[in-house]
Design a protein with these regions (language model features):
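Long, ordered, helix-rich scaffold segments
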Residues: 2-192
């Protein structure tokens, strides 16, 4: 087998049928901020991720209201997911935004909101909403909840939420690991 065979003939980049015309690639770097916000719920991942990156790079505060509207009203779970990250990237994420995300019908959005909640500790309203998720049906949400609760200062609400997570983990080692990571020196209290 000659591995150098064909080296003098160039490289094939695309095989396409005769008459096929490639679609144009959008130049999102020239897009208006409002258009980038709308792209956060685009079905194509490249559009969503590029729009999110450009919003972060621009740090345009005029995007915040549109992103907040998207978080609360988008029919796209991926759009709501990216809205949380974009608000966080613009340093505009509030406890109300996180609570909206934690109450979302899509598990991935709840998980992302749980992660974002860590920056808002010690918000009591966020802690109470996190504590209400201990019986969530999604294991990834529960695991993130276990980690996120560790960022909040010790309290009765936090301890009870971690105990509830541990009791309802169904033997899931990842959830248990998250809970024990958050308990730290309070681990003995969880068993009393």
């Amino acid at each position: 087998l000659d591995l150098t065979s064909g080296r003098d003939r160039g490289r094939l980049y695309r095989i396409a049928p005769t008459g096929w015309k490639p679609r144009s690639v959008p130049h999102l770097s020239h897009a208006k901020t409002a258009d980038l916000v709308a792209l956060l719920e685009h079905p194509n991942s490249w559009h969503r991720e590029t729009a999110s990156r450009l919003l972060f790079e621009r740090q345009d505060a005029s995007a915040v209201d549109g992103i907040r509207h998207l978080l609360r009203n988008s029919k796209s779970g991926l759009g709501r997911f990216h809205a949380i990250g974009s608000l966080e990237g613009l340093n505009a994420l509030t406890a109300d935004d996180v609570i909206v995300g934690l109450k979302d019908s899509v598990a991935g959005v709840r998980e992302r909101a749980g992660w974002a909640s860590e920056k808002l500790a010690p918000s009591e309203a966020v802690l109470d909403t996190l504590a209400a998720l201990t019986d969530d049906e999604n294991a990834r949400v529960k695991m993130q909840l276990g980690f996120s609760l560790g960022e909040f200062p010790p309290s009765e609400t936090r301890r009870e939420a971690l105990q509830s997570l541990l009791a309802g983990s169904g033997g899931d080692r990842w959830i248990r690991t998250a809970v024990f990571t958050s308990l730290g020196t309070e681990a003995s209290d969880a068993f009393l």
